Swiss-Prot record:
This is DNA-directed RNA polymerase subunit omega. GO terms for biological process: DNA-templated transcription. Belongs to the RNA polymerase subunit omega family. GO terms for cellular component: DNA-directed RNA polymerase complex. Gene3D superfamilies: 3.90.940.10. It is an enzyme of class 2 (transferase). It comes from the Bacteria. It comes from Pelotomaculum thermopropionicum (strain DSM 13744 / JCM 10971 / SI). SUPFAM superfamilies: RPB6/omega subunit-like.
Length: 69
């Protein structure tokens, strides 16, 4: 799968701002854990890996009063 399109990603979240926050938080998690492979693929940048996971419904989010979890 190539990089997911913005339209495809926006179907998974409620707004583009949510998409940015969720992708950034997941990319930070991947960086801290040193995991930037998606399904055994070659090493990729953390943000790209995060966006791929969002497109594949592997990452979810929960909106709270204090932000997005």
């Amino acid at each position: 799968m190539n990089q997911p399109s913005l339209d495809e990603l926006l179907e998974k979240v409620d707004s583009r701002y949510t998409l940015v926050v969720v992708a950034a938080k997941r990319a930070r998690e991947l960086t801290e854990r040193g995991k930037t492979k998606a399904d055994g693929a070659a090493v990729m940048k953390p943000v790209t890996a995060a966006l791929m996971e969002i497109a594949q419904n592997k990452v979810g989010y929960k909106r709270t009063r204090s932000g997005i979890k």
